[in-house]
Curated annotation (Swiss-Prot):
InterPro entries: MFS, MFS_dom, MFS_trans_sf, Sugar_transporter_CS. It comes from Buchnera aphidicola subsp. Schizaphis graminum (strain Sg). It is found in: Cell membrane. Belongs to the major facilitator superfamily. The chain crosses the membrane at residues 42-62, 75-95, 109-129, 133-153, 157-179, 191-211, 238-258, 265-285, 304-324, 326-346, 362-382, 383-403. Its main location: membrane. One of its GO terms (molecular function) is transmembrane transporter activity. Coiled coil: none annotated. It is a multi-pass membrane protein. Pfam families: MFS_1. GO terms for cellular component: plasma membrane. This is Uncharacterized transporter BUsg_567. Keywords: Cell membrane, Membrane, Transmembrane, Transmembrane helix, Transport.
Length: 413
């Protein structure tokens, strides 16, 4: 059994056990409303992130078909994450006015339709533009889903529901990458977009039908002066600024590595197919373990020390990818990803401790910088690939992570 067949077998086994466990937990909750909420939000998170990240594993396919550099091809993802980062700042307050469910449902529907339209285009500029609109639409789910959970779910069940939603995000992003890489290899990227688009369209209809309307939502008017003032206060907070910068560097590093590792593995001495490269997305599931593990460790040890250890793990994993052995590269990516998810978990959870007012807006700012880092570094890394190949990418990311470690030294427990 080769390593890819083995990884596929492990994936299907873990998914079966995961969903069996979820089924039993949901059964214990035993309320129709709760079941509808968790399953709808899982589906919403799954669809959103499968749309967002379906392009990442097929960037070399775009490069070949449209005669693009790696930098230009990465715009299909960077354009979406850039507009999504901007949308997260403003969609939240808009949902305070017109409602949570309507924002999320319309966002999913629009994103699905845009993905289907994207599948029939053969103009790269149009595709990037449509992807930018798709990212803006998806910000309606990213920025609102967690607020809906806090408002509508009993406090004792919030953690489980939040975890299931985040699992939907992770598994959706992983599945989108795998499915698009397989369909692009055996059919075309057009077919990949059509399949993912229509699946998401059906998901948005099920989401709209099954998700209960908000019972604890009360519309409020938007006070733009207060809105901008809160942003200003957060940006004046030195600790929050450091956390925003670390989030910016974390996501930028993570996306850059997975944007360009596919180009490396398609070359000598690996010559991997796009579908095999797509299955590397299974590595993302390391976050299911490392994120909660980091949460346990920061309650026992110094939070900033655990953050620095996680960042050092990312550097260690990245150094391992310099070898020309596929097993060592995969192991390096696993270590790198584990460090990333642990670091992100620590940094994002720290926001609430230092935001004294308007914590939702503080979280929105973190997400803004988080996805902005994905857009900027994810595209800028292409220049390092063009001139220096993988050693250039690795050096670029290691420098970024060293800066993140230096910034973390200024953080107190």
């Amino acid at each position: 059994m080769d390593i890819y067949t083995y990884k596929k077998h492990i994936l299907f086994k873990k998914c079966f056990l995961y969903f069996w466990k979820i089924k039993n937990v949901i059964k214990k909750k035993n309320t129709k409303k709760f079941n509808q909420i968790v399953l709808s939000l899982f589906l919403g998170g799954f669809s959103s992130f499968s749309i967002l990240y379906c392009v990442q594993s097929i960037l070399p396919v775009f490069s070949k078909q449209f005669c693009l550099t790696a930098t230009e091809s990465s715009l299909s993802l960077s354009a979406a994450t850039a507009t999504m980062s901007i949308g997260t700042l403003f969609i939240g307050p808009l949902s305070d006015r017109i409602g949570r469910k309507s924002i999320m449902s319309s966002s999913l529907l629009i994103a699905a339709v845009l993905t289907i339209i994207c599948s029939i285009s053969n103009n790269w500029t149009v595709i990037v533009f449509l992807r930018a609109l798709t990212g803006l639409a998806l910000s309606g789910v990213v920025a609102v889903a967690m607020t809906y959970i806090v408002e509508e779910v009993h406090p004792n069940s919030v953690s489980f529901c939040m975890g299931l939603y985040i699992s939907g995000n992770t598994i959706g992003g992983c599945s989108g990458r795998i499915l698009s890489s397989i369909l692009a290899e055996y059919f075309s990227w057009h077919i990949a977009f059509i399949v993912i688009g229509f699946f998401s369209l059906m998901s948005s209809c099920l989401f709209l039908y099954f998700l209960p309307s908000s019972k604890n939502f009360y519309p409020i008017s938007i006070d733009f002066n207060k809105f901008l003032k809160n942003f200003y206060l957060h940006l004046k907070n030195p600790t929050l600024l450091i956390l925003f910068a670390i989030g910016f560097m974390l996501m930028g590093s993570f996306i850059t590595i997975f944007n360009y590792i596919s180009y490396r593995l398609m070359l000598s001495p690996f010559f991997l197919s796009s579908s095999n490269i797509g299955f590397l997305s299974i590595i993302y599931l390391t976050g299911v373990y490392s994120s909660p593990k980091a949460g346990i460790l920061i309650n026992q040890y110094n939070r900033s020390s655990i953050l620095r250890i996680a960042l050092l793990l990312m550097i260690l994993g990245l150094l391992m990818t310099q070898y020309n052995e596929i097993f060592i590269i995969i192991l390096g990516l696993v270590i790198f990803s584990s460090g990333f998810f642990a670091s992100h978990s620590i940094a994002s959870s720290w926001i609430g401790f230092h935001a004294k007012i308007a914590k939702v807006q503080a979280t929105s700012l973190y997400l803004f910088f988080y996805y902005l880092g994905s857009s900027i570094f994810g595209t800028f890394g292409g220049f390092f690939w063009f001139y220096l190949k993988w050693i250039g990418i690795s050096s670029f990311i290691i420098i970024i992570l060293i800066f993140a470690i230096l910034l973390s030294l200024k953080l107190k427990k």
